[in-house]
Amino acid sequence: MKTLITTLNSKFIHKSLSLRLLYVATKNYHNVDFCEYTIKEDLDKITNEIIAMNNQVVAFSVYIWNVELIKILCSKLKKENKELIIILGGPEVSYEIDYFLDNFDIDYVISGEGEIVFKQLLDCLENKQPIDIQGVSSKDNRDYRQSKPVDLSYIESLESPYLLKRDLADMSKRVLYFETSRGCPYQCQYCLSSLEKGLRFFSLDYLKKQINLLMKTDVKIIKLLDRSFNAKTEHALAILKYIFENYREGVQFQFEINGDVLDQRIIDYINDYAPESLLRFEIGIQSTYEPTNEIVKRYQDF
């Protein structure tokens, strides 16, 4: 079955890691391709392009910035081809299965991480088998469980999603999103990340290999997707040390960190060894009003 994995990014410079992960996890087993659009593009144009590809399956990665547009897009696609199978996945759909199945013109929702279950779903569709997969729901068969967390060593065994040949030509024009861990140690009630339990880390050997290979491209900005890069001090220090020793002139790394739990060892290491203009940090405050922080379980020490 010809399958397209796609999404609407907020800007052209943003590059969807999720599409590339699903692609490398399925391309050796199914006729799968991916493409990206932006929220600024005309939906009729996108519809016509997707229909012209003659896909049998279209899978969307859904986020807060594109969910309403994807709702419209799904209706347009189904109007053009009622037989088209539409799958939604991503953080925005994972916790409201009923809402999306009841209000969107779609066929399936994947809840949770998709690298394993997306392939399993395509297997079933290809072979016309009954679908009984944890984390996969249809209008008639709803599974409110999340898919099982993916063993990160499995992802490490796949072709690198960061270094696909098709991406090499415009590496300098787009932000490269990179993950060294999954999960979040915090419980902030306003954030979907708080629903994931525990932290999992990619192996240092894998991360070092990816960073080393990326330094041989002309990428300019590498933004880490880790929810709190400094959640585990030893891990953060190991990554920083490798970056400092192997970086290329003209590249910048951007991190999201929690300032109130920033270990002094990290501060000292950056002050002593960080090359100029190599690092950028996002430090979330959210609120300085303590009663609000307590209600939403955003614990921070000012």
Where in this protein do the model-derived segments appear?
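A structural micro-motif
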Residues: 1, 30, 84-85, 250-251, ...
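A short, flexible N-terminal coil/short beta segment enriched in small residues
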Residues: 1-17
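Glycine-rich beta-alpha loop elements in corrinoid/cobalamin-binding modules
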Residues: 2, 18, 25-26, 33-149
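Residue-level recognition of beta-strand->loop/alpha-helix junctions
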Residues: 7, 34-38, 61, 195, ...
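Mobile, glycine- and charge-enriched loop segments
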Residues: 15-36, 75, 170-176, 181, ...
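Alpha-helical structural signal in soluble globular domains
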Residues: 25-29, 76-80, 103-104, 124, ...
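Radical SAM [4Fe-4S] cluster-binding motif and immediate context
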Residues: 159-302
